[in-house]
Amino acid sequence: MSMPRQLLLIVCALVLLSAYAVTSKAQSRNVDALTKANQGTIGLVSGPFGSTALNFASDMAEVLDDFENFETRLVVKLGKGTGQNVADLLYLKGTDIAIVQTDVLDHIRRNKIYRNIDGLLRYVTKLHDKEIHLLVASDIADMSDLSGKRVNLGPQQSGSFITGSLLLGLSGIESDIRLDTDAVALRKLLVGEIDAAIIVDGKPSSLLTNLPTDHGLKLLPIENQFMAEKYKSATFDNADYPSFVQEGETIPTLAVETVLAIYNWRPDNKRYPQAAKFINRFFSKFEELQIGTYHPKWESVDIRAEVEGWERFSAADKWLKDNPIKPDAPEVDPLRQQFEAFLEATQPNSNWTPEQKNLLFEQFRAWQKQNNQ
């Protein structure tokens, strides 16, 4: 082989090696980017547009996302209602947690929607309460007027439908049921196409606060004794909805609890460690959600609260047991501090017993009180 041909082959080989190195480096960068984009991701199904659940999910993402170490990234998805959120949690790929109403379990059991639902779902923590808003046209005086009227309950898998259906059923009211979303129902209510809408959402709901001030609608009180056995008492006041409630007045209603639900991953499942990592970060940074400009309902959330009828996810239970509440430090009596400092300064080598110190201090306190009169 001639020298020029050998040189040509060597040059070609070097070019190919260089191209391979560039390609390998580019592929490596792509793999790194793919890994970073997916590691630590937790899929959270929240609530529909305008809901308190969506606000909560957005707050959580802002506080918990970690783009520096890629340990946690919350991917928030708009939900279609509490029943659909359960379906997404069970079957939708990339969904790890969901915000759902606690009464959804009773609804699923009663209607036999899923087998072994108690073994499939767990909760991480109780979240906010969702109040029942019974919005009506101005000519509706009380709930009995809803018989035969056009009442929107929301889509069949929504929390409003689940809770609203129970409310009407226990009240013995048969209405012309509509299944529009809450936002669509409000628009129809404003123009008279329906007579009422039952919306279950945490107060203050932006669905109501964003209405024009001259909306002409009313919030009816809800005081059903049968519902009160299942749900919590609540009220609306002027601070919640200035255009619905006069200063100094309240409107009674009921509320349903919500939880951060999670699929019951077994500890040996590959998703379990990531779920546990998310829970550790969420609980560790929880106090940040109770301050600042986040939704006001965070202030009432107690991550240690038990939820009747639900079982807590094992990783969440472990974190709470490993991080017990520290007892409040006993209140320090300034006078006692001064007394102890005086004894230490004047009699450093004394052998006072605790009982003798206490007796001497009480005599000193009585003497001081007498001299200050």
Where are these regions (language model features)?
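Ligand-binding clefts/hinges and TM-proximal coupling segments of bilobed small-molecule sensing domains
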Residues: S28, Q156-L167, A234-E308
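Bacterial N-terminal signal peptides
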Residues: I10-A19
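Extracytoplasmic small-molecule ligand-binding "clamshell" domains
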Residues: G40-V45, S51-I97, G248-T250, L360-Q363
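An extracytoplasmic/periplasmic, membrane-proximal ligand-sensing/linker region
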Residues: V184, D201-H215, L219, N264, ...
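Pocket-lining segment of extracytoplasmic ligand-binding domains
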Residues: T102, K112, I173-K270
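Bilobed "Venus flytrap"/periplasmic-binding protein-like clamshell domains
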Residues: Q39-F67, T72, K130-R187, V191
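A structural signal for short loop-to-beta-strand junctions that line the ligand-binding cleft
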Residues: R115-L127, F244-I251
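Pocket-flanking alpha-helical
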Residues: E62, V75-N116, L186-K188, P204-L211
